[in-house]
Design a protein with these regions (language model features):
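Intrinsically disordered or low-complexity boundary/linker segments at protein termini
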Residues: 1-18, 88-89, 94, 104, ...
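Glycine-rich, Arg-bearing micro-motifs that act as flexible, cationic patches
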Residues: 93-111, 240-263
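Structural beta-alpha unit
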Residues: 1-2, 45, 55, 59-100, ...
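General small-molecule cofactor/ligand-binding pocket signal
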Residues: 36-38, 65-69, 121, 170-172, ...
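Small/aliphatic-rich secondary-structure junction motif
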Residues: 1-49, 133-184, 207-210, 268, ...
């Protein structure tokens, strides 16, 4: 997270409290990054609002500028601004959709998680992060190089946030149910699966100092266990990742992040591998 030099903050002019800006200011002060405030709107001029918010951030000692623009949709507008302004993180307040609307249309926040060429922090509430818990969600059953790098990125970002807020780091990984038909004896017994995941977690628990009572390895689907544990420990932030798939439509996020977004009470930081981010950025530049 220390490498982020500019943060794009999506400003919702219809909201009285700008909680995304509150989070961005906390992070910017800690990592000494700049802020760029963005209003996605073309029907009304919000220059005075942006000027006021920019001046407030500047008064707090944060380098800040702003813009208002619109390109066919909110996600497209944000993504273009990320590339134009050279931002390494997007912070946006989550806008929940009704079940009916989600059944008919892809929620705008889901689109942003899928296609944004930078990590995205979705802010779910205005609660203070200070001295809170941070949950890093990884898949200890995936051992390829891309997942390994992504896992380390997830846990290192979570550890950075813990340092920033004097918080407690938790680690979660869901494992599958035993399968008697599995060719690998490890996956035929529940105990051996759990032991395998426990062994794999050692790399992260040792490196980042995760206490054993803060390690959560259990059987079940990730999109069920992650919200359950996050809500149980009262997590301030949940950090998750996705390995994208390249194709004509661009890189697609795994739906775990989308599903848990609405189930979590905590803020959600979604990370992608560097090659996926580069692919998305190249699509925007075409």
């Amino acid at each position: 997270m220390q490498a982020v030099k500019r943060i794009l903050v999506v400003i919702d002019p219809t909201r009285k409290e700008q909680v995304a800006l509150k989070r961005a200011s906390l992070i910017a002060r800690f990592i000494e990054s700049e802020l760029h405030l963005l209003v996605c709107e073309n029907r009304q001029d919000y220059g005075p609002l942006l000027q006021t918010l920019t001046e407030q951030a500047t008064a707090e000692g944060i380098t800040c500028d702003s813009s208002q623009s619109w390109h066919s949709g909110m996600t497209e507008t944000i993504n273009r601004a990320v590339v134009r302004e050279g931002c390494g993180l997007v912070i946006k307040q989550h806008t929940p959709d009704s079940a009916l609307r989600k059944a008919l249309l892809t929620p705008e926040d889901w689109k942003l998680l899928r296609y944004c060429p930078a990590p995205v922090l979705m802010v779910k509430n205005s609660d203070s992060w200070i001295k809170g818990s941070v949950l890093a969600a990884i898949d200890l059953g995936s051992h390829d190089d891309q997942h390994h790098v992504l896992h380390d990125t997830i846990v290192s970002h979570a550890a950075d946030i813990c340092e920033m807020i004097s918080g407690q780091l938790h680690l979660i990984s869901a494992h599958p149910a035993p399968m008697l038909s599995s060719a690998d004896p490890t996956f035929q017994l529940r105990e051996s699966i759990a032991a395998s995941y426990q062994d794999a977690s050692g790399e992260y628990t040792d490196k980042y100092g995760v206490a054993q009572d803060c390690l959560h390895i259990d059987e079940g689907p990730a999109d069920t266990l992650i919200p359950f544990v996050a809500n149980k420990i009262g997590a301030s932030v949940t950090v998750i990742g996705t390995v994208g798939r390249k194709g004509i439509a661009g890189a697609l996020i795994g739906n775990t992040a989308e599903v848990v977004l609405d189930q979590l009470n905590s803020d959600v930081l979604v990370l992608k591998p560097d090659d996926t981010l580069s692919h998305l950025e190249s699509l925007l530049e075409k």
